[in-house]
């Protein structure tokens, strides 16, 4: 009986030690992600980055996204609601991170649309029709182009701008910045430079609310 108690006690100690070790590792990983973001803060926003909301808002959400990403599509209205619910206090900056096969050409179309002043309309159309052009985790640029025909983009300008040094540089810059910030999946969120470590809708809302509290008070 005593032996069983000793064995059980030893097992409990081992499990406890394992849990403590895992918590330490999680804290260390969280610290690494946050320090990486802080050291590379200049990589969060670029001049070409599309922006929505009040330019003077003191809370900034930066989102790295892939238009072929289903989770990005789900979170898009959530982020729009955040801006709507805190008018003038929160702005959104989006960055390209084409991880799905074929997505790089799609984000080039989006950036070409930005040059025509129709980025947000094109993004809305992209998400609304995602199931038609993003199939089995692969983006199909030709199908994408057909899906956004209602936006009214000039196709010749888009075709030319997609291959322009400006658009190619913008897309590559975003990819490089994502790497520098440790973003390897989409959507990747930062709120006032602080990365969203534990992914989820409630976690994002909490991060935004904390920033609102710091910047604007209760």
Predicted regions span which residues?
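C-terminal cap of thioredoxin/glutaredoxin-like
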Residues: 1-24, 146-218
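Ser/Thr/Pro/Gly-rich low-complexity linker/stalk segments immediately outside membranes or between
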Residues: 26-40
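Functionally engaged cysteine thiol sites
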Residues: 34-37, 112, 161
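A short beta-strand-turn-helix
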Residues: 41-59, 84
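Short secondary-structure boundary/capping elements
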Residues: 43-44, 74, 170
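A generic local structural motif
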Residues: 46-50, 78-80, 175-177
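Conserved strand-loop elements at the edges of beta-sheets that form or border functional pockets
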Residues: 54, 63, 198
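Structural alpha/beta surface segment adjacent to cysteine/selenocysteine redox centers
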Residues: 57, 62-68, 73-149, 154, ...
């Amino acid at each position: 009986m005593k032996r069983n108690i000793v064995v059980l006690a030893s097992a409990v100690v081992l499990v406890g030690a394992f849990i403590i070790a895992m918590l330490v590792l999680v804290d260390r990983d969280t610290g690494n992600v946050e320090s990486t973001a802080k050291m590379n803060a200049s990589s969060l926003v670029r001049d070409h980055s599309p922006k929505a909301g009040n330019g003077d808002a003191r809370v900034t959400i930066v989102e790295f996204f892939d238009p072929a990403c289903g989770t990005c599509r789900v979170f898009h209205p959530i982020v729009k609601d955040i801006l709507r619910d805190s008018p003038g206090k929160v702005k959104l900056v989006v960055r390209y991170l084409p991880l799905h096969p074929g997505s790089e050409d799609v984000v080039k179309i989006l950036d070409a649309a930005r040059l025509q002043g129709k980025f947000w309309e094109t993004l809305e159309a992209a998400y609304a029709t995602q199931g038609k052009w993003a199939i089995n985790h692969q983006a199909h640029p030709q199908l994408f182009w057909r899906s956004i025909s209602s936006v009214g983009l000039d196709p010749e300008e888009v075709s030319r701008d997609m291959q322009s040094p400006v658009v190619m540089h913008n897309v590559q810059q975003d990819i490089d910045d994502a790497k520098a910030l440790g973003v390897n999946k989409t959507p990747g969120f930062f709120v006032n430079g602080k990365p969203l470590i534990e992914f989820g809708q409630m976690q994002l809302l909490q991060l935004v609310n904390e920033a609102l509290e710091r910047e604007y008070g209760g």
